[in-house]
């Protein structure tokens, strides 16, 4: 019999699983769910193994099958992204970013990036990884009317400040950034362009968002668990020469990682194959659903930002909830109703610590089979809460609503016999 405390821990996990998988509308823009098949492949002995180094050049023995997995994953990502070099060893998008910064900037160098209030990720700024590497930053200018980087002002800034590295991509990311235009300006001062594709990686793989490497970026980094619905992890893909790629490779190991969380490789491969087969349909539906949610919110009196631009071209929707008490209050009230969003700073906020907005992403609910009609229902739930209805009453309706959306779509269907076959192959005790 298990100790009582382990039963208590199991109960916590069980209750979490039931709550987030079956009872909530999950609109966190940085999350997703793996397919049942990918989850099966995620459970394996590699969770406890090391493989320092690179394929064919390891510092540990016992890695012959790790090499097969890593090599296969690198080759498939390289083909899909049309990249000269891919590294799948970073354990997160942030680690991928840090390794790239370290490899491509001199000591005390300068990075041009978007601040948090314009959507920049913390790893792009002095509150995060840039500061840890003692790099200087200059802020890319923002065009509020177009909710995007101000191209003309960015050209001027690049010419004047001559940054070593320019970071595009964002944490709040509604519209594709002007990669081509910025890359042309970067070329005049010898700067590298990195596009952080963490949020839109699945949309890129699905073919509904521009591939930054084909737009002129030297590097794209990503995480493998947002719109790309795999296990948590990171990836770097480049259009650089061998020398620069080797610098990035050495920055990943030994500088920023020692263990690569090898058990994720097989599940990531499964997800990539699923995206090859189902990705265009899935990614297209994500963008359609995001637009539908935004339009429905507007009709409910909860207008998202960027109305004149069509609200969004990604999985995300951002709403200024100042008149409903601000981002903190709105997100907390919605959680009471089992609608999970996050507070988020908007460009006009005086302090990112007091955000006026909330950010939503539709990628997870899309994977559970929801479409435009369901987005309209979700908008009604959100509006009911923000207009002051008791969240407990809305929660009852949300739980009932979710009962019809428990099966993960856009993946391979496997029957019970196939599940048992895969599980028995991976189960360490058989």
From Swiss-Prot:
Q: Which Pfam families match?
A: SHMT (PF00464)
Q: Where is this site: Plays an important role in substrate specificity?
A: 225
What is any one GO biological process for this UniProt entry?
Answer: glycine biosynthetic process from serine
Q: Which InterPro entries match?
A: PyrdxlP-dep_Trfase, PyrdxlP-dep_Trfase_major, PyrdxlP-dep_Trfase_small, Ser_HO-MeTrfase, Ser_HO-MeTrfase-like, Ser_HO-MeTrfase_PLP_BS, SHMT-like_dom
Can you tell which superkingdom this protein's organism belongs to?
A: Archaea
GO CC field = cytoplasm
Tell me the keywords, alphabetical order: Amino-acid biosynthesis, Cytoplasm, One-carbon metabolism, Pyridoxal phosphate, Transferase
The EC number(s) attached to this protein equal: 2.1.2.-
Please indicate if the UniProt record lists Ribonucleoprotein as a keyword: no
First-level EC class: transferase
Q: Which cofactor does it need?
A: pyridoxal 5'-phosphate
Q: What is this protein called?
A: Serine hydroxymethyltransferase
Instruction: Record the organism.
Output: Pyrobaculum neutrophilum (strain DSM 2338 / JCM 9278 / NBRC 100436 / V24Sta)
Record lineage: Archaea, Thermoproteota, Thermoprotei, Thermoproteales, Thermoproteaceae
Name of the gene this protein is made from? glyA
